[in-house]
């Protein structure tokens, strides 16, 4: 493979593992690919498990019982590769008020390094709705922004993953108002917004959304690139990296180690 190490991101904090049931390849393979691409910092942030009490079994995240083994696996690899790359372990989490305290206890008990917010649902997973589903319902985009702001005000999340996941296709004025509200609050809290490379690489997805990043640029938000890697191939996607870098032209700042 061509050596693209001089033209690729140096740090990534968004990567998944096979435990989420929609990713493949091993953690070791991810790390080896990251080293080959010249990445200096690599964070695993698999989908956080949820403490369901009604017997619901998620098809898109690990179980609570798998979480200790997940962290232990990454910690062993962190020690093994310490002279070649800095490795972190954490979670990507939705802010769901009824699960928040128990998830934070899990986070602390496992000694995780960080957590990023990826607000895939407007509530618990089994209740939905999925924020990436096209909608003209104003209440959904309003609820999305409200949840993100409330969650970020806890101070528990390092950055906001794919902030433009909300697929509102109603009135432009509503979208602009709500996303401006989100961007202003994230700037006030000094929370970086992620330009998502997985969305860029899979052309059928509606994000990264140019209209969102124009708003973020006008507000002056910090931006960070995230691989959102679900397989080794995503770690090698130089084309999507270059396209995502173009989104930075809209923003006035960028987070460290992008």
Predicted regions and their residues:
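Domain-core and long-helix interface of multi-subunit machines
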Residues: 116-219
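Conserved small/polar residues in nucleotide/adenosyl-binding loops
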Residues: 250-257
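Alpha-helix termination/capping residues and helix-transition junctions
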Residues: 36, 109, 154-157
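Alpha-helical scaffold elements within enzyme catalytic domains, especially in hydrolases
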Residues: 33-36, 80, 150, 185, ...
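Hydrophobic alpha-helical segments and helix pairs
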Residues: 88-130
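An N-terminally biased module of ancient metal coordination in phosphate/nucleic-acid-related enzymes
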Residues: 1-95, 102, 107, 169-173, ...
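H/E-rich (His + Asp/Glu) clusters that bind or coordinate divalent metals
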Residues: 199-248
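Short acidic/polar active-site loop segments enriched in Thr and Asp
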Residues: 40-41, 113, 158
């Amino acid at each position: 493979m061509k050596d693209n190490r001089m033209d690729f991101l140096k740090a990534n904090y968004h990567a998944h593992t096979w435990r989420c049931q929609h990713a493949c390849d091993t953690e070791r393979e991810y790390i080896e690919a990251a080293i080959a691409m010249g990445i200096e910092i690599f964070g695993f942030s698999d989908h956080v498990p949820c403490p369901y009490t009604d017997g619901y079994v998620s098809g898109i995240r690990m179980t609570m019982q798998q979480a200790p083994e997940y962290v232990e696996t990454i910690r062993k690899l962190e020690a093994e590769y310490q002279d070649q790359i800095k490795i972190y372990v954490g979670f990507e989490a939705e802010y769901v008020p009824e699960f928040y305290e128990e998830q934070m206890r899990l986070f602390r008990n496992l000694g995780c390094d960080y957590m990023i917010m990826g607000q895939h649902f407007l509530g618990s997973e089994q209740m939905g709705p999925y924020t990436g589903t096209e909608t003209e319902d104003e209440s959904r985009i309003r609820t999305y922004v409200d949840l993100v702001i409330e969650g970020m005000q806890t101070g528990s999340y390092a950055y906001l993953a794919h902030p433009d996941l909300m697929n509102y296709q109603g009135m432009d004025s509503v979208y602009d108002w709500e996303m401006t509200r989100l961007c202003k609050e994230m700037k006030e809290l000094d929370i970086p917004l992620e330009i998502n490379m997985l969305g860029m690489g899979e052309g059928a997805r509606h994000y990264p959304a140019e209209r969102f990043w124009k708003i973020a640029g006008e507000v002056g938000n910090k931006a960070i690139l995230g691989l959102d890697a679900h397989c080794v191939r995503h770690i090698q996607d130089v084309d999507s990296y270059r396209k995502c870098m173009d989104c930075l032209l809209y923003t006035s700042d960028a987070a460290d180690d992008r």
